[in-house]
Amino acid sequence: MEFPLAQICPQGSHEAPIPTFSTFQITDMTRRSCQNLGYTAASPQAPEAASNTGNAERAEEVPGEGSLFLQAETRAWFQKTQAHWLLQHGAAPAWFHGFITRREAERLLEPKPQGCYLVRFSESAVTFVLTYRSRTCCRHFLLAQLRDGRHVVLGEDSAHARLQDLLLHYTAHPLSPYGETLTEPLARQTPEPAGLSLRTEESNFGSKSQDPNPQYSPIIKQGQAPVPMQKEGAGEKEPSQLLRPKPPIPAKPQLPPEVYTIPVPRHRPAPRPKPSNPIYNEPDEPIAFYAMGRGSPGEAPSNIYVEVEDEGLPATLGHPVLRKSWSRPVPGGQNTGGSQLHSENSVIGQGPPLPHQPPPAWRHTLPHNLSRQVLQDRGQAWLPLGPPQ
């Protein structure tokens, strides 16, 4: 008000302290007082410019460095919390002047009679300011809003649901500590309050109340002409940029149906031909244990010498006859260490040469001139190592 908050007398007391300022100065005690009273008005960022009661015309309010930022906050606060009840059919009351400075408000009220008033936005806090013409100067009162939404003059007890009701109350009840009342409002000369676009504010508030869901950009199908989008309530405003459809995606080349129906033959390796002559044949009779090889067959030895007794000679010779037998290389035989096995038996007696008998068709890997029966009966086979003599 017109004195520091530290000089506010206890509520219920009508003793007025000596005024020292034409408008009260915001201090830390003011913030504590607002918290104790439950006010929701924002704390001021810069104090109202002070002036002496006798030199009101010399007071000049210098906006702080954050004035543009403060105006943006005030505009957002007004749109969210005050516009729905203050605006009537999209029009603001005549006594609300919006963003006008303290100096301009004093210039407008200077020629007016005592008690003439107006309401404006504060230059130091996010709230309203009541400015009226007193007997000697113009006085400025900050208006606060309680947690329940009621409006009060900062430092007063009377709280009201609407700002219009608060102004009407002080036309009949004086404002302490000076005992001055309000008489008539000062109507503004502009159709809208300064710094506010009521059409935009009302349309934004209406769109948010009707459609609380977030807005999404429409999807335009290919082949359809884009429809110009206009903002709700914009009226004569030009639409912003039109949405451009994306270029069509080139189609893939079509292939003949034969490509999909006829499978491509795959190259498969030819099976290996089976050998005409097998490596070995199954014998008709079992083979003796010492004649059976172990492991995989290696290279065949060049010669194998075996001496056997021949019982088919005539008995007139009187002595056994041994003959030298030369065997052919055995296919698939083993050759241990690359050495050749030779055997030779001395001839006890010489007899007439025996006729050559073809070997029987044996299906085994032993030499053809080896008598299996002799090996089985006598079980004697001398296989000496070393070259033949």
UniProtKB/Swiss-Prot annotation:
Major localization listed first in the record, in broad terms: cytoplasm
Biased composition (Polar residues): 203-216, 337-348
Region (Disordered): 41-63, 190-295, 324-389
PTM remark: Phosphorylated on tyrosine residues.
Tissue expression pattern: Expression limited to tissues of the immune system and, in particular, activated T-cells. Expressed in peripheral blood leukocytes, thymus and spleen. Much lower expression or undetectable, in brain, placenta, skeletal muscle, prostate, testis, ovary, small intestine, and colon. Expressed at low levels in unstimulated T-cells, but not expressed in normal resting or activated B-cells. According to PubMed:10692392, expression is not restricted to activated T-cells, but strongly expressed in blood cell lineages, the endothelium and other cell and tissue types, such as heart, lung, and liver.
Biased composition (Pro residues): 245-256, 352-361
Residue numbers bearing the Phosphoserine modification: 217, 296
Residue ranges that the Swiss-Prot or TrEMBL entry lists as coiled coil: none
SUPFAM superfamilies: SH2 domain
A cellular component term, taken from the record's GO annotations: cytosol
Renumbered ranges of motif SH3-binding: 244-250, 272-278
Compartment(s) of residence: Cytoplasm
Keywords: Angiogenesis, Cytoplasm, Developmental protein, Differentiation, Phosphoprotein, SH2 domain, SH3-binding
SMART domains, per the entry: SH2 (SM00252)
Induction: Rapidly induced after activation of T-cells. However, the gene continues to be expressed in long-term cultures of activated T-cells.
Molecular function via GO: SH3 domain binding
Function: Could be a T-cell-specific adapter protein involved in the control of T-cell activation. May play a role in the CD4-p56-LCK-dependent signal transduction pathway. Could also play an important role in normal and pathological angiogenesis. Could be an adapter protein that facilitates and regulates interaction of KDR with effector proteins important to endothelial cell survival and proliferation.
Subunit structure: Interacts with KDR. Interacts with TXK and ITK.
Protein name, UniProt field: SH2 domain-containing protein 2A
Organism this protein belongs to: Homo sapiens (Human)
